[in-house]
Amino acid sequence: MATKQLAKQLGLIRRSSKTSQTSSNVSRPKARQFFEYLIIIDFESTCWKDGKHSTQEIIEFPAVLLNVSNGEIESEFHTYVQPQEHPILSDFCTELTGINQQQVDDGVPLKICLSQFNSWIQKLQKEKGIAFVTAVPTHSTAEHKMCAFVTWSDWDLGVCLLYECRRKQMKKPDILNSWIDLRATYKLFYNRRPKGLNGALQDLGIEFSGREHSGLDDSRNTAKLASRMICDGCVMKITKSLDKVNHKISYTRPQQVLPAQDSNSVQVGTIQTSEMHSEKNPQPSFDKTAACVNVMNLQKDLEPSSLKINGKPIGRDKAVTMLNGHQGQESLPSQTLINGLSTTLGNGPKRCFTNRTSLGTLQTGVSLGAFTSTPAELPSLGSGHVLMSTTVTSVTDISALDISSTSDCLSMLADWEDAAVIEDSQEEPSVPTTEQSDLLMAQTSVDVTLPGTNMANCNRNQKYGSFHPHSIAYQSRNTTIYNINVKQNVSSCSTFKVPGVLARRSTNMMPTSAQLNKMSTSLPSFPKRKLSSVSFYSPPKKQPFIIHEDKCSSNNRSLPVISSRPHNVPPTVLNATVNNTFKSAQTGKITAPMCNCGRRAKRLTVSNAGPNQGKAFYTCSVKKRNEENKKGCDYFKWEQTVVKEKSAQSTIILSKSGISFSSNTSFTAANSASRRSFVSLRPSMRT
């Protein structure tokens, strides 16, 4: 034996490597794992044998850090928590968990416990460089090691801690919103249902160490089970997340014309659709769907038929349609070329995009947007977060339009904004009125520069839509009207007129000839439109209600109103608003009277054979069963008698107010001079 040991020390005899290989195979995971560290949590909460109390509180907060590569527990966190809602533990809870009342009394509240747990996590992040998968993007580098939380079921983080924080209005750490359910993973991997944590360990030949239902011991045994499953080839993945799923957001940008670099060429940019993925789960294929700009050079002397995009010829109409943002969707490369700057979108270097409007692009008659890319470090933005411009191809100022004085544009003016008018008697614009006024507009056309037109005719120095300062005829908060006679440097490019809209004309409210002669006087410096094409009254599209007016009372509209002769009111008005009591009496449906005992009488019908069969009567609703029952009364009345009484009462009320009824459902006001009725306002309502 001494010789053999000496030979081993001198290295003459090699040791057998079978044992070392077997032990290394057991400790090393077979499959490549995404998470290098796992934090196993197993809470213990208050409980009762009868189950009457449904709100459970955490009384033990354990957590252990497991190294996936070697299966060792490198750090532990453990504390007892004071219950606030039910501070006294039940005997069943003490017997089950082994936690006594003194331990929870010496513990800390849950809010302080979460703060201590957060400090422990931050310490691990600094020492071991771990990182968690959260919805909030973090600047993770290659040195960071991914970590996830593991529980035996969803109860710990999905029920117990979640609802307790909601009840107590406490902020839960965001890193606890996602975890791995080891019980569900065990069931899927081994294809069998485990019988508790102890049963799952026994199935794999692992002995449970410690005390069951002890939070720290359960966490350690769960870590053993997770390490064994990883060695068997199970890949740990997130099974539950409380974070809201951020769906893909598609941003569609219209085709835009970028400012021309010289007078012989113009760059036409086509911004495509990009999909912004959720930053919680970054996709490696994000660069495939990034936004891009395809830059083309259109020569000066080319014909419209020779225009090409990506090597494909296009026509004049298609080129104009692409400029308007309706066509031209092409492929989506992974880079963007904007104003000569190559910018990588997605997971590349961060660029800060700002939106601006180029004045040189006003030659096209539309508002165009351009990007300016400047490198900027944005710590609040994660990987794949890109700020996109939201400039829409639209006309934002009425100064860039010419609106004609024909009747086709009247309906368009009503849809744009409130019509602005200028009085003829004034030399300068003032407050607009609706009478003796005229509206100064130019022709409704939008000048759009074609890519194939001669760009030399459209000088860059001539900005379309720029007017002389003295050319403003009227200006308000929402409207600016220019004098077209003073307008200078009008572009000679091709124009596209807006399709005309036929306005609905009204002939019943046309002004008289005297009013037309009076309004024919025009301002000396501003052109006027023809009054024959103007409709001063636009009837509503739909009548909201019908007004019934008495012809004989239309002449007298002053207060007080004196009724000198009877007025006949239509039956519709009478039936709708006047004398509901009389109407109910005529139809036979009246309100049941009150009986002697203060209750509402009940309407019954005679069913026995005889002369009164079928007649209705009212009696007390409480039936008198015997002589001892004294709750009811002996009230009885025929319905005809009740109707007559109701009619007599309504007649007395109307006679006191000076109105009498006749058989033809018309009422008459008393014409006595001493009983005139005046309609006037109360002193508090007078102005």
Swiss-Prot record:
Signal peptide: none annotated. Binds 2 magnesium ions per subunit. Its cofactor is Mg(2+). Residues 38-226 form the Exonuclease domain. Its EC number is 3.1.-.-. Keywords: Exonuclease, Hydrolase, Magnesium, Metal-binding, Nuclease, Zinc, Zinc-finger. The active site is at residues 44, 213. A zinc finger (GRF-type) spans 595-642. Zn(2+) binds at residues 595, 597, 620, 633. Mg(2+) 2 binds at residues 42, 156. One of its GO terms (molecular function) is nucleic acid binding. It comes from the Eukaryota. AMP binds at residues 44, 213. SUPFAM superfamilies: Ribonuclease H-like. It is an enzyme of class 3 (hydrolase). Mg(2+) 1 binds at residues 42, 44, 218. Belongs to the ERI2 family. PANTHER family: 3'-5' EXONUCLEASE ERI1-RELATED (PTHR23044), 3'-5' EXORIBONUCLEASE 1-RELATED (PTHR23044:SF61). This is ERI1 exoribonuclease 2. It comes from Xenopus laevis (African clawed frog). The gene is eri2.
